[in-house]
Structure formats: structure tokens, C-alpha cells
Amino acid sequence: MKHTIARYKRHRFPPEIIQHAVWLYYRFNLSHRDIEDLLAERGIIVSHESIRLWCNKFGPQFSNRLKRRRQGFSDRFYLDEVFVKIQGKQQYLWRAVDENGDVVDVFLQSRRDGPAAKRFFKRLLKKNQGEPRSIVTDKLRSYGVAHRDLCPDVEHDSSLYANNRAELSHQPTRVRERVMRRFKSMKQAQRFLTVHASVYTLFNLGRHLVSAKSYRFLRSEAFESWRVVSLT
């Protein structure tokens, strides 16, 4: 409880309310004003600006704790990159997911050339604490450069349609981008996408693949993990 008090020191609202607001923001397609209204309906009067500050401050903390609790990813990674417009300039969002659709990493860069691909590969290898068994990408040549220089022994599949899993994984980001009316800066976008990926992965339970009983059990475990990282 001492850690909880220290983390939420100088905040007049209880930790339970703050962590719930942060969870709502990163779990669902809601704006800060939407969450302000949801809390007001429960008799909790807090400004959308306070909610924004909570999300910016505590979101990365919770995300880092979730990553430390994670057991690991599957041994097959799907990589893809899409462009996002930030302050009128085209940037590239690199993303890697595993076979379960869990997000391994997201990384914003201004290019998608060989050096950019190598930077992304280095992050992946560091986060995974080693090489995966195989990687799946599209036919962008930059992936071949990074694969040859950094992990030549890893199987590399770039066949047509093999990378659909990674391409589909961008959809939640596109939805949030519209809700937020585009990202305001590289720093803000990287922070949001990193936390969003951690929360998405925690609650990515494959609802359509398991029974209702199994889903409720997995959901309870996910909620417990969230309580641990946010309230202890």
C-alpha cells in the first residue's frame, strides 16, 4: 500500500478512480471528454484535462509493469509498417505481432529504409531477449537488409498474403487515430501507441476462439493483472 500511496501522491482522487480512468482511455475508443462524462454519471466530477494528465503520467508506468509481468511471445513474428501523418509530415509506424495477435512492439520512425528496419529489428530482438524462430513480412526490401545483417539464421517468409495478420493489427490504431483527430507529435504518438499496445495485448483474449466460461476466466485474470500493476 505504501507504493500505491507514493505513486498517487498529491492526487486528490482515490487511486481506484485514477486507474479506472486510465484503463477506460487505453482499453476503449473513448476521448478524455467521453471518460469525463462516464465518471460524472457515477457522481465523480473531474475535468477532461485531469484525465489527460493521468493518462500521460500513469499510462507508461502501468505499461512498463505489464511488460515486466509478461511471460513471453510465440516464436513467429509478423511485421508490417504503415504511414501516419503527424504535424503534416508522413511518418512510419512499424509494428510486430506474434501468432496470437499480441503486440510485440510498435515504433515510430520518419523512414522505412534499411537503417530504419535495422533499428526496429534491434528493438525486437532486445525485447524478446533473443531471436524468434521465424519472421513474416511483406516484400519491402528494407526487411531483407535487416534480416541479413542482424538475424540471418531466422526463417524469413515474405510470400504474398502471409503477412495479413500484421496488416490487420493496425486497425485498432487507425480507429484511435480518428478519435484523437490525428496524433499531435511523434513523442505523444509513441507514448500512446506503446501503452495502447500493452493494454490491448493484456485483454486480447481470443473471445471468438474460446468458450464463454473460458473467456470469463481469462478476463478475470486480465483484470487481476491490471489491478496488480495499477494498485500495488
Task: Name each model-derived stretch.
Residues 29, 87-103:
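Short conserved beta-strand segments at catalytic cores or DNA/RNA-binding microdomains
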Residues 31-44:
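DNA-recognition alpha helix
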Residues 159-175, 184-190:
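RNase H-like two-metal-ion nuclease catalytic core shared by retroviral integrases
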Residues 73-86:
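Two-metal-ion RNase H-like nuclease active-site motif
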Residues 45-46, 53-75:
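Short, basic alpha-helical nucleic acid-contact segments in DNA-binding proteins
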Residues 21, 35, 51, 80, ...:
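Mobile genetic element proteins and their domesticated derivatives, centered on retroelements
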Residues 179, 190-232:
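C-terminal domain-tail junction helix/linker
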Residues 12, 57, 106-128:
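Active-site beta-loop-alpha junctions of metal-dependent nucleic acid enzymes
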